[in-house]
């Protein structure tokens, strides 16, 4: 079963890599090229039909922010459920203790759902989440002139409330009221952890609360007219350098509370339900993925609507309305990215816990030099991955810029229309002279949009190869490299665990920084384009001012961070954890034969006889549930193997 589940998750992760990384390169190559040549060099409005990169830019919004985000959240969705199902499978055959004592099988064949309640729970929670999302969309409504953000928030909170109610009844029905995990030591069964159904519910509640909390913090650091974004826009008055400095500071500060929320969710979920609780927290956060995806798609839809309004030369007030919608869309997109990063962190931890269970690892000893070395390598990988993604955008954007400049120079109709537009300096086309209008209209359809689309497409396919290989090959190289060099599969499993720990911690922080810094730069630029612009020392700086141009530069710097490298790190974290889970059986078999003489961790003999894992399988791989652990028994029966790793003396667990 585990092999089938991990294979499915690996497939979801692989496609997410292509959609997120490739989509990010596609959209930002077009966006950066269109902005630098169109808005900064030529001085024409965003999404103007004279800009050959306009179509590629609008298509890219859908490729990166809809398809890419959807694949990212789907990967987290699948990964969290599979991590929880694998850990739930370890409960099969364990014993439960009610409040009045008296042991009975909790997950045996005579229990609820033939003992598969813990395995089926993630699937049922996902089903309730789909229903909750459908109902939540009914609460999304805005009165004429109202704030669309309030309607979207109301829908999300409604879905979350429904999810909590449904989740409570599901968890209490599928799981026994209370149970314990045990470990066989010298023929004696030792209780290693105790759990309750209500504890599992609290774990799911913590995951849901963590997702909402990350969204609120992200909105504060990236939303229009919030303190941090206003400060970034005000710093634009003194030039691009101060704008970029302020944005970097904003992005770094924005990592604080999301990490605290994730830490609280991890500690709380582990306290209430052990490693299974961490996986259920990830499922709880992602159960309402349906409505979250709908909210994330709002931004690209509003952005494309503005592009269509500009290309169709609709009245000025139409573009102003779409710009206000787009500003809200930038915030929802930033919140969605924060949510995706938080969910990726919990999903990676769930998969990491499942890897430890399958590989038979009780603890990872960071004083072991192999583990410490791999921790550093893992922490380095997100920076290298981001560098590859950013460099890819830079190269593709350079090709796009050359193509747009070539068309402005070599297509006579475009060149003449651009000169007339610059001569009229922002005046509506209706106020131009008849001669100028004829020149402008002659350029209609002369731009070679297909060339720009082709550049983005080929760049996305070509440039995703290096980041993809880095994510896929590194865990395989580390695991089997250590196995070949040391000849010890147990050391290889520990080293791979260190690699995953390093990449998860570093990757989450870097992803939050890049995503939120880019979002702050984006909306700081938008503030110059709305209403009276940005007021500094009694002077209003509007669209087209030097401060606005500095904001455009900051936004251009932030584009590849928030839409390519930052979100792509989610895929790196989860894909590496999934690959580790896939290859874990190849690491555990030999290691266990060396230490225990068994083919699996602690319970191979029982599994051979009964056809299902023994109680030893469960507790050998999960150290404690909610802190009620008999550590003394573990300490008495562990010895040092000389490498700083504890090994059981008996075959009861490893």
Segments predicted by a language model, with ranges:
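Long, low-complexity, intrinsically disordered segments
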Residues: 612-654
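Hydrophobic packing and interface segments
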Residues: 1-612, 617-618, 654
């Amino acid at each position: 079963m585990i092999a089938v589940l991990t294979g499915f998750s690996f497939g979801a992760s692989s496609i997410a890599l292509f959609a997120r990384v490739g989509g990010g390169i596609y959209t930002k190559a077009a966006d950066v090229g269109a902005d630098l040549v169109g808005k900064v060099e030529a001085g024409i409005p965003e999404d103007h039909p004279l800009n050959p990169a306009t179509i590629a830019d609008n298509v890219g919004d859908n490729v990166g922010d809809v398809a890419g985000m959807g694949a990212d959240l789907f990967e987290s969705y699948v990964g969290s459920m599979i991590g929880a199902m694998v850990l739930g499978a370890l409960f099969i055959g364990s014993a439960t203790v009610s409040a009045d004592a008296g042991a009975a099988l909790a997950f045996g064949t005579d229990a609820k759902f033939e003992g598969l309640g813990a395995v089926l729970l993630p699937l049922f929670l996902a089903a309730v989440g789909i229903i909750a999302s459908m109902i939540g969309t009914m609460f999304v409504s805005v009165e004429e002139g109202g704030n669309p953000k309030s309607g979207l928030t109301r829908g999300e909170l409604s879905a979350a409330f429904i999810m909590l109610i449904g989740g409570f009844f599901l968890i209490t029905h599928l799981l026994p009221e209370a149970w314990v995990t045990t470990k066989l030591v010298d023929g004696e069964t030792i209780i290693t952890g105790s759990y309750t159904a209500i504890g599992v519910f609290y774990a799911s509640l913590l995951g849901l609360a963590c997702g909402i909390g990350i969204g609120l913090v992200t909105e504060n650091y990236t939303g229009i007219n919030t303190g941090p974004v206003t400060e970034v826009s005000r710093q634009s008055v003194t030039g691009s350098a101060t704008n970029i400095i302020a944005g970097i500071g904003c992005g770094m500060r924005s990592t604080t509370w999301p990490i605290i929320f994730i830490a609280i969710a991890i500690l709380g979920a582990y306290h209430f339900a052990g490693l299974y609780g961490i996986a259920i927290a990830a499922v709880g956060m992602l159960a309402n993925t349906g409505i979250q995806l709908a909210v994330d798609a709002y931004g690209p839809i509003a952005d494309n609507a503005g592009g269509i309004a500009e290309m169709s030369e609709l009245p000025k007030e139409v573009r102003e309305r779409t710009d206000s919608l787009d500003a809200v869309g930038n915030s929802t997109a930033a919140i969605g990215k924060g949510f995706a990063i938080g969910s990726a962190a919990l999903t990676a931890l769930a998969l990491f816990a499942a890897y430890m269970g399958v590989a038979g690892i009780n603890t990872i000893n960071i004083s072991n030099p192999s583990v410490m070395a791999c921790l550093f390598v893992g922490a380095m990988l997100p920076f290298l991955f981001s560098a590859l993604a950013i460099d890819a955008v830079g190269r593709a954007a350079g090709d796009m810029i050359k193509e747009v400049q070539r068309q402005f120079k070599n297509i006579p109709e475009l060149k003449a229309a651009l000169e007339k537009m610059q001569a009229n300096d922002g005046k509506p086309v209706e106020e131009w002279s008849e001669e100028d209008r004829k020149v402008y209209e002659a350029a209609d359809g002369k731009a070679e949009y297909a060339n720009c689309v082709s550049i983005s497409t080929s760049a996305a396919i070509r440039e995703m190869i290096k980041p993809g290989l880095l994510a896929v090959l590194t865990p395989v190289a580390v695991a089997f490299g250590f196995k070949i060099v040391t000849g010890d599969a147990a050391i290889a499993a520990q080293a791979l665990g260190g690699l995953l720990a390093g990449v998860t911690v570093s990757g989450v922080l870097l992803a939050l920084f890049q995503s939120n810094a880019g979002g702050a730069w984006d909306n700081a630029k938008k503030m110059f384009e709305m209403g009276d612009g940005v007021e500094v020392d009694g002077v209003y700086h509007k669209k087209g001012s030097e401060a606005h141009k500095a904001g455009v530069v900051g936004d251009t710097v932030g584009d590849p961070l928030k839409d390519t490298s930052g979100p792509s790190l989610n895929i790196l974290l989860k894909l590496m954890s999934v690959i580790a889970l896939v290859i874990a059986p190849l690491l555990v078999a030999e290691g266990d034969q060396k230490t225990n003489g068994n083919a699996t961790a602690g319970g191979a003999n029982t599994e051979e006889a009964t056809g299902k894992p023994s109680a030893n399988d469960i507790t050998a791989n999960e150290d404690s549930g909610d802190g009620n652990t008999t550590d003394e028994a573990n300490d008495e029966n562990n010895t040092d193997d000389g490498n700083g790793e504890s090994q059981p003396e008996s075959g009861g667990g490893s």
